[in-house]
A protein has these predicted regions:
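General small-molecule cofactor/ligand-binding pocket signal
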Residues: 34-36, 90-94, 145, 190-192, ...
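Small/aliphatic-rich secondary-structure junction motif
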Residues: 1-54, 160-225, 245, 273, ...
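Gly/Ser-rich helix-loop-strand patches that form or flank binding pockets
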Residues: 101-152, 242-243, 247-286
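A short helix-to-beta-strand connector/capping loop
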Residues: 78-90, 217-223
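Active-site phosphate/pyrophosphate- and oxyanion-stabilizing loops and adjacent acidic/basic residues
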Residues: 23, 134, 179, 237, ...
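A short acidic, glycine-rich active-site loop
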Residues: 53-69
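Charged docking surfaces used in two-component/phosphorelay signaling
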Residues: 88-101, 232-233
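A short, acidic, amphipathic alpha-helical segment used as a generic capping/interface helix at domain edges
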Residues: 210-213, 229-242
């Protein structure tokens, strides 16, 4: 897998569990993590080079100190049950805005996954949604792992993969990606088709359905379910709860999340209100 990007802020507790998830994914998928912290230094025309360098060093020191606290939390709470696979860290402490630097790093580096926590602050969640919606990530096919507010890491034993069975570009690659994730975490997969009514999709005529059937026939830990319900959020949350899901996975369509039934507002609501982490993969543009 490509590198994992973990943007973080200073003295914000929502990043602790998000950091744990980022490290777990980096360890299990055997990839490097980029730790990104941004800051703004306002300097007048009369500032000297030495003073500016001192301001930069002070910001770097604070960022390194924050990383130390995140590592301490991880080691105290989670390292006992982890394998000791060493992962590499790439530190990026940059004078700039977080949103723009996330885009710059994703554009310039081989980033495959960005880990973002949900906050109880509306302005922060608004920024997170702007990141989720940005077309840069569609062009670069960067996936997003959204960690729920007050979420606590749990082993990923059950993955729920949402699908409307509509054929997307290169859909087999997404199926392979979720299988790769399941193998890395030794997880079960529930391929779940949620429809607003019984006649929405003719399963047998769907290439996606046929491909999923091939997958489930090869592995008894991978199953397919079909749910009928007008309230998408309620149906998803109920299924997640009933089946002890630890990760929710879905494809963001080029235009809308799972095109019609899973439209943009549903994307936002699932991302911000899910009780389990949501992995959003992007449809590849032709």
């Amino acid at each position: 897998m490509k590198q994992i990007l973990f943007p973080f802020e200073i003295d914000n507790p929502i990043y602790k569990e998000a950091y744990v998830y980022a490290v777990k994914f980096a360890r299990n998928l055997n990839t490097q993590m980029i730790l990104l912290n941004t800051f703004i230094i306002t300097a007048g025309n009369d500032i000297t080079k030495d003073k500016y360098s001192k301001l930069i060093r002070n910001k770097w020191f604070k960022a390194y100190n924050e990383v130390s606290k995140l590592n301490k939390y991880y080691l105290e709470e989670h390292a006992r049950t982890d394998n000791q696979l060493i992962i590499k860290f790439d530190y990026r402490f940059i004078n700039g805005t977080l949103k723009e630097e996330i885009k710059n790093v994703a554009r310039e580096d081989a980033v495959g996954l960005i880990v973002l926590p949900v906050s109880d602050r509306k302005e922060m969640n608004k920024r997170q949604l702007e990141i989720i919606h940005d077309n840069l990530f569609e062009k670069n096919r960067v996936s997003l792992l959204v960690i729920p507010f007050k979420g606590v890491f749990k082993p990923i034993n059950n993955i729920v993969f949402l699908t409307d069975l509509k054929k997307l570009h290169h859909f087999t690659q997404y199926l392979n990606n979720v299988i790769q994730c399941a193998e890395a975490f030794d997880s079960n997969i529930h391929f779940v088709n949620i429809s607003s009514k019984e006649s929405d999709v003719n399963q047998e005529n769907s290439e996606v359905y046929q491909e999923i059937m091939k997958i489930t026939n090869k592995n008894p830990r991978y199953v397919y379910e079909r749910l009928i319900g007008n309230n998408v959020i309620e149906s998803v949350n109920q299924y997640v709860e009933n089946n002890n899901a630890d990760l929710l996975v879905a494809i963001k369509h080029q235009h809308y999340f799972l095109e019609t039934l899973f439209h943009k507002s549903i994307t936002d609501e699932i991302s911000l209100n899910s009780k389990v982490p949501v992995l959003i993969m992007r449809e590849i543009e032709d």
